[in-house]
Amino acid sequence: MLAAMIILLTGCGTGSVFDGSRASDASGFRMEYSILNREESADLNLTEGDRLRVSLSHTEGSADVIVGMEGKTPIYRGNGQQNADFVLEIAETGSYHISVSGHQAKGNISFTRISGEIK
């Protein structure tokens, strides 16, 4: 009986690193998770004049977020983010690396490309 309880309790720790869904395509990068305790990333091709809408909503934990082009100063860096909704202006065409590192985070995050093209 004691051995069974020990096995049961050790399976209930905070060892999970990711339980959720993620999607990445030309329009953006989205994740929803009941636990995010690692880094997830995606690359998004953006054009000068585009905007990137960033939305974070966490009911538990937090996330560190970095958005930028390889080898350049990031256009955004936020540590310990819980809830936010803002827009980044894209000043240079290129491939932008988006990195999200969760810390016992539960919630969702999205990065949505808003085209700068005039229609």
Which residues are covered by each model-predicted region?
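Edge beta-strands of jelly-roll/beta-sandwich modules across compartments, strongly enriched
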Residues: 63-64, 100-117
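Acidic, Ser/Thr/Pro-rich low-complexity intrinsically disordered segments
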Residues: 47-48, 55-69, 91
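Short tyrosine-centred short linear motifs in exposed loops/low-complexity segments
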Residues: 37, 48-52, 92-96, 106-107
